[in-house]
């Protein structure tokens, strides 16, 4: 029996979680819970894992909190109201209208059409 050790912990967007689950399922580690989680992630995914990682990287200049960047890359909001409803979680920073527009522009570059 092999042991699993957690070396690091990070917030990840839905599409990255889906990619990791795909790898687990393909290696034979499937269960009903994993399959249902995969199906859910597949239904809400708005960009692929690579694009989501790029969104997170580009957002790091604007949004300092990793969890907020992961949520933005998961949900892919495209209006200022949607972005503001997520950014409210970051109580350490006030975002300008320019910041919000930059976030929307970054997300729109990578979102699935």
UniProtKB/Swiss-Prot annotation:
Its EC number is 2.7.7.6. Transmembrane segments: none annotated. One of its GO terms (biological process) is DNA-templated transcription initiation. It is an enzyme of class 2 (transferase). It catalyses: RNA(n) + a ribonucleoside 5'-triphosphate = RNA(n+1) + diphosphate. Keywords: Cytoplasm, DNA-directed RNA polymerase, Nucleotidyltransferase, Transcription, Transferase. Pfam families: RNA_pol_Rpb4. GO terms for molecular function: DNA-directed RNA polymerase activity; nucleotide binding. Its main location: cytoplasm. InterPro entries: HRDC-like_sf, HRDC_dom_sf, Rpb4/RPC9, Rpo4. Belongs to the eukaryotic RPB4 RNA polymerase subunit family. DNA-dependent RNA polymerase (RNAP) catalyzes the transcription of DNA into RNA using the four ribonucleoside triphosphates as substrates. This subunit is less well bound than the others. PANTHER family: DNA-DIRECTED RNA POLYMERASE SUBUNIT RPO4, RNA POLYMERASE RPB4. Part of the 13-subunit RNA polymerase complex. Forms a stalk with Rpo7 that extends from the main structure. This is DNA-directed RNA polymerase subunit Rpo4. It comes from Saccharolobus solfataricus (strain ATCC 35092 / DSM 1617 / JCM 11322 / P2). The lineage of its organism: Archaea, Thermoproteota, Thermoprotei, Sulfolobales, Sulfolobaceae. The gene is rpo4.
């Amino acid at each position: 029996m092999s042991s699993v050790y957690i070396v690091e912990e990070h917030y990840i967007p839905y599409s990255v979680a889906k990619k990791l689950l795909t790898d687990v399922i393909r290696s034979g580690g499937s269960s009903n819970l994993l399959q249902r989680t995969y199906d859910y992630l597949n239904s809400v995914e708005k960009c692929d894992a690579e694009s989501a990682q790029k969104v997170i990287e580009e957002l790091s200049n604007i949004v300092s909190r990793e969890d907020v960047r992961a949520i933005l890359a998961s949900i892919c909001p495209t209006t200022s109201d949607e972005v503001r409803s997520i950014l409210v979680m970051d109580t350490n920073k006030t975002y300008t209208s320019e910041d919000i527009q930059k976030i929307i522009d970054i997300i729109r570059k990578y979102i699935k059409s």
